[in-house]
C-alpha cells in the first residue's frame, strides 16, 4: 500500500523568491534553554560557576556561626525524579516539581583560647531535602496547582554605567545638566550629577546629594591626588623683564586649542621672541598645522595671565613645612595705587622665591574647573569627615562613628555579598569607559568611580555622546532561569539568617546539617514566585499561536522594571535597534502599548541577556551562506543590506547602490561597503505578524490588531488550514506542541482515538523496548475553557519518520496552524446589516457547523468536615423532587453524557445545620421515631444561570483513609484498565521484537540440546520452531558459543524490560488507588466538566487576519444571500467601507488569491472525477500543473507515481493552498496569473445576484475566499439578565456585572434623561423600589405575588448612608415630616 508519509503534508505552492539559508530556531527555545541552564548548572560540562542553582548556593554558602567555631558548606545538589508526571499533576491539581536534595558539610573547629588558632575537630556530611523545584514541561510551561503557567521574560535596564542629561527640564534657563549613573545587578545605585552652578555631586541610592569630592576623599584620595586624577599640569616659569622684554610666564604652547579663535594678546615664542600671531588675528588651521610640525614651542604669556589660574600641587617650604598653597587654590594678586603688587597668593609665592609654579591645565573652553570648584565648595578636607557625611546621608538620625561609617561605605560598593555588577555590568562598564577589568571583578573599584566622573566631566566639556537608554544594547532580557535564580537567592538568604541563629543556639558538636536547616523559606520563595509574581502568568491557551506568543513575550513591567504610569513615550516607542530583535507590530493596545513586546522570529537571547539577530556575511560584494548572530551594540559597526536586495545566481548584488542600515539610519551605499545582509525578510516581525499574508500591504495599526486577534481565535470543531498562508503555519503548530510529532522513525502498530502505538525502527538503544506510545488528549479543558482535542492522522502500517506529525491538536490541520475557516465572502452593503463593521452570515454556516466550537467548563464541589459534623455527598437531599435528581447516580454524582441546564443539580451535597433548642414534645417524638431529617441543609452544586451543556467527565478525589463510593471505584477501575491495556500492548510489541531477534540469531544454527522431542544436532528452521511454543525457543541450546552468549544476553534484556514494565505499571496503579492529597478539612472533592457546543450567532465577534473585525449582525437564510452566476451563495458579507479608511488592503489581495486558489482546486476536482470515470491520468496531471504552475509542478510532482499524485490531488480539491511569506510574497502579477489560470476575470470581481429578488446587482462585486476567525468574545459569555439578585451590603443597591449576577447601572445621565422627559413616577421607581429602598422592594414583591398593583416608595438606603456620613463629619441632620413642620 502507498505509505501515508507522502500524502500527509498538504503541499503549498510557495511564492517567495528569497532563499532562506537559516532554519527558523525553535520558537520556545528562550524559555527552555534558560530554565535548563538554571536547573542543570551543577553538571560538570560547560557551565560556569555562579549560574543557576549552583551559583545561588555558592553565593550563600559557606555559612559561619557568629563566633566562627563552625562552618556549613555546600557540596553539591541533585534533583530527584518527580513523584507525579505532567498528566497526573494536571488531573490532581498538583505542582509538577522535583525534590531538590542538597549535600551539606558541617565543619566544627576547635579554637585555641590563647592563640586563637583553629583546628578541625569534626566534619559531618549529609543530604538535606530543600523543598521541591518546579520543572518545565516539554512545551516550556510550568504546572502549578494543576494549571499551566508561563513565566514571561522581562526587559530591564542592563547593569553598567549610563550617561544622560535632563534635556534642560530642571533649570529654568534650559541649561543641560549632565548625569551619570552606575546601575549594579544588585546593590546600591551610584549617581553623579551636575547642578546649575556646574558643581559635581554624587548620590547614593537616590538620597541627599553630596559633593563628589566627599566621595573621593572617602575613597582615600587627598586634594593633590584628586587634582592629579582629573587635570593635566602645566608649568609656568617666571621670565624677568630685561632686554626690551616685559616680564611674563613661559609655558608650553598647544596650537590645537587656539584653532579658529582670535587671541586677545600677541602670541610670542619664548625662545626666539618672534610674534606667532598678533592679538585679534584669527588662528587658521594652516598655521596650526605649521606650528605642529615645528614640534614643542614655549609661549611667553603676559605677567597678569597667571591670575585666576589654579595651583596644581601643594607648594610647601621643604625646611619649615609651611604650606604656601594647596592643590586647587586660585592664584590671586592685589595691586596698590602705583601698580605694584601688594598682596594675594602670587605675592606670597614670589616673595618666597617660588618662580616655577605648577598650574592646572584649565582654560575654561576645552577644560572646565568643575571638580576644582566642587572641591573648593566642599566643607570636608579629610577621609574621616567624608565617611561621616556619607553615613549621615545613608542612616539619618544615627550618631556616626568612624568605624561604623567606614564599614558602611565599604559594604556599599566593595563587598561582593552586598554589591554585584554581574558579568554583563562589568563588560558594559569596560566598553563604555575603556577599562580592562576582568568580568569576574563584580564590585566597583576606585578606578571605575574616577573613570565615571572623568567621563561625566568630559561630557560637560563637550566631548563624547550621552547614551540612549532605549537602545537594545542598554536593555537586556531576564528569562525564567534568571528570574527564578534571583527569587531562590532571596529565599536562601532568609534561610541563612535562621541557620546562623540556630548554629549559635545549639550544641554544635551533636547536631547534623539536617537539624540546622529549615527549608521552608526557600520553598516559600519559589511558591510565591510561581503563584503571585507579576511575571508568572496564567498561560493564554486559547489556541496554539497564543501559547507560543505567551512564551515569547518580553515585558518591561514587573519587579525591578517599569510601571505603566511612569513609562513615558520614549520607552514605548519603536527603536531602530528593534529591527530583527523585537517585533515593531505586535504589542497590546491600551495602557500597556510598547511595554509588552514580542521576540522577532529569528531572534535569540545571548549569554549576557542581550537579544541577537542573525545576518549572512557579505565578502567582496558576494553573499555567503555563513550566518553570524549580532547584538545591537555589535551591529552598530556594520553596514547591513536588506534581505530583498536583488542578487544574481552566484550571490552577487545586481545593483551598484544598495539600500542599507548603518548605525540605526537607512541609507544607500555602494556594494563594496556592505558587509552583512538580512537572513530573511520576516526576521523583523514576530510569529503572529509573520502569519499575516500580504502584511506588507496593511497599515501598521491594523496589522497590530490582526496580530493580536489571531491569538484570540477559538479552536473550531473542524479545523481548516488557510488556502492563503505564509509558510509559518507548520512551524507554529510544531513548536507549540499542539500537534504530536513522532519522536523517532518507525511503523504504526495500532491507532485509535485515544492513542497511537509506534514500533520504532530508528534510534534503537540497547535495552530499548522499541515502543513509543502516544496518548492523545481527548476533550480536555484549556485555561480559557476552549477544548484541547487531538486526532490521529496515520493508519496502521504507515511508515513515519522522526519529527513527522502523527496527530493533529486543537486548531491544527495536517500539522499546520488552523485557527479559522476559508469562506466565500463578498464586499458589498446589504440592507444596512453591515453598518459599522457588522458582518452578515449565511445560514449555511450555522447548518454545517462551519464556525462551531466546543467549550468546556469546570465545576467543583468539596465536602468538608465542619464543626457540626461532616458534609456528605449523596443522592438523598431534603425537599428535592425525583425530577431534579434524574441525572444523578446512587452516589449523588451526575452521569457522564447527561444534558444539563441552569439550576440542575450536578453533585448532591448536604451540610449539617446548627441544632435549634428542642421542645419536650419534639424530644419525645424524636426518642420514639429516631433521627429527624431536617437537621441538614441542601448545599448541592448546581449549574449557574445561563449555562447549558453535556457532562463529559467527572473526577472524584478522596482523602487518604476515607472509604470510596461506587462512582470513585468505577472511575478507578477504568483508569487501571487503561493502564493495563498500555502495558499489554507494549509487552506484545516487545515480545514480537525480541522473538524476531531471537529467531534471526538461532535460525540455521545447530542445536546441542533442547526441549523434549528435539534431538541434538538438528538444524533450526521454520518447521522446528513451529513445533515449539515461543516460550520454549529459549531452551534451544545452540552449538555456536558466540550465538549462545547473544541469546543469553537477549533473554536477560527481555526479563529486565518485562520487569521494568511491570514495575512502572504497579507504580501507576498504586498512585491511582491511593488517596489524594486534599486541602486540610476537605474529605472528598468532585469535579464535573460540562461541554457546550457554541454555534456562530448574532452578537459573536469575528475577524480576518488583517485587523478587520466586526460583530455578526444577522443570520440570513441561504436562499436570501447574494449568489454568483453559477449559483454559489456567498457565506459572509463584509462592509466595503471598512477597507479604504483603514488601509488594510492585504485583505483584498488575500480575497483575490483565495478565490484563485478555490478555482484551481475546483479544476483539479473536475479532473479527478474524469479520472474516476475513464481512468485517464493525463487531465489530473494537467490540472495539477495548471494549479501549481509549471516550475513548481516540475520540481515537486513531475516524477511522482500516479497513486501518490492522486492522494495529493485529492487533498487539494477544495482549493490549492499557497504560501506567500511576509515582505516576499505574491505580487500583483502573480495574483493576476493565478486568477487567469483559474478561469476568472483578473479584476477579481464577479456578477452577483440578489437572493431575495433574483435580480442582478447594479455592478460587479468583489467576491473571494477569505480566512475568517471566530474570536473568544462570544455573546453567550457576555449576555446576562437579572430579575432579583444580590445587593451591596452598605448601600443596598444591586451589584453590577455578570460575575456578581448584577443589574444595569442607572447613572446620573440616565436620571437626567428621565428628568428631561418629565417621567417623575418612572424616575421615583428607578431610584427607590427598583434600587435601594429595602422596605419598598419587599412590598412591591408582595403586591406582585398577590396580583395587586399598588405600592409606595420609601427612603432609599443610600440616603441613610449619606446622613450617616454627614454625621461622621460632626453635623447632625434630622429629617422632619411635612406635617410636623406645620
UniProtKB/Swiss-Prot annotation:
Nucleotidyltransferase keyword on record: yes
Keyword Transferase: yes
SUPFAM superfamilies named in the record: beta and beta-prime subunits of DNA dependent RNA-polymerase (SSF64484)
One Pfam family of this chain: RNA_pol_Rpb2_6
Role summary: DNA-dependent RNA polymerase catalyzes the transcription of DNA into RNA using the four ribonucleoside triphosphates as substrates.
Assembly: The RNAP catalytic core consists of 2 alpha, 1 beta, 1 beta' and 1 omega subunit. When a sigma factor is associated with the core the holoenzyme is formed, which can initiate transcription.
Designated name of the protein: DNA-directed RNA polymerase subunit beta
